[in-house]
Amino acid sequence: MLYFLPTPIGNLADITLRALEVLERCEVFLCEDTRVSKRLLHLLAQNPIISHSFPNIATKKREFIAFHSHNDQEFLNQIKPSFFDKEIAVMSDAGMPSLSDPGMSLAAYALKHNIQYDVLPGANALTTAFCASGFLEGRFFYAGFLPHKSKERRLKIAKILNALAYLEEKTPVVFYESPHRLLETLKDLNDLAKGMHLFAAKELTKLHQQYYLGEVSQIIERLQQSTIQGEWVLVLLNEKKIEPCMGLSALLELDLPPKIKAKIEAVMTQKNAKELYFQRLLEEKNQ
């Protein structure tokens, strides 16, 4: 049996009873970082309530195997489905497996090979931050971590905002970001989503948890005066309607004269308008 086991994102008290039962029962742990998972079990065992109800949670002999984005496919190619005849749990360092953490490929593998598995509900930064944001929209778009390089990051942000422009309703976008890239990401957001409101959550559920709300430029101004630490969740509210762009294929389907279509296509593709015009005439003749 395979279990997808959520772990606390900061506060150890957020562990669930079901998770504790699985932690004590399992023989093998597939871990994002084996050191972090071992430390979690050790810390949980220090709690007198947990140690009384689950005395073997840290003492039982079990196997810890690294399972992350750099080795997941290699691992799955090497094992046989019978490997999961044991009691096995997949764990990320913090939060829910598969949400910007290892696990999604394992679920696909289990489905393909008819392996029984269960996903335990539990703590994750995504829903915690969205609920804390105060944004009234009952839906959101989860973008996960943005690319490290500015050019790629800006391109991804632009693509997301452009895609959301086609929706009639406002749809907040949730990003994860690390402390050393936070200001760079906020500056990119400010350039591409100027005037939009942002909710930023620092170190959710931890001792130094903190919330920020305001326009992106205002949050940049506040954070530039402080030392940025901890993991962050950003919830961007796309309040301003972004005019969607019509794609080339959609434009060519409009009821327009061939010459007009050719001129539009030439501008969009940098091709010769005259050649495109004769191509459109030929297409209409063959219809």
Swiss-Prot record:
Cellular component GO terms, alphabetical: cytoplasm
The enzyme's E.C. designation: 2.1.1.198
Pfam families per UniProt: TP_methylase
Domain of life, per lineage: Bacteria
Annotated catalysed reactions: cytidine(1402) in 16S rRNA + S-adenosyl-L-methionine = 2'-O-methylcytidine(1402) in 16S rRNA + S-adenosyl-L-homocysteine + H(+)
Any one GO MF annotation of this record: rRNA (cytosine-2'-O-)-methyltransferase activity
Keyword S-adenosyl-L-methionine appears in the UniProt entry: yes
UniProt keywords, alphabetically: Cytoplasm, Methyltransferase, rRNA processing, S-adenosyl-L-methionine, Transferase
Enzyme class label: transferase
Compartment annotation: Cytoplasm
Presence of keyword Magnesium: no
Annotated family: Belongs to the methyltransferase superfamily. RsmI family.
Function: Catalyzes the 2'-O-methylation of the ribose of cytidine 1402 (C1402) in 16S rRNA.
NCBIfam families: 16S rRNA (cytidine(1402)-2'-O)-methyltransferase (TIGR00096)
Descriptive protein name: Ribosomal RNA small subunit methyltransferase I
Organism: Helicobacter pylori (strain ATCC 700392 / 26695)
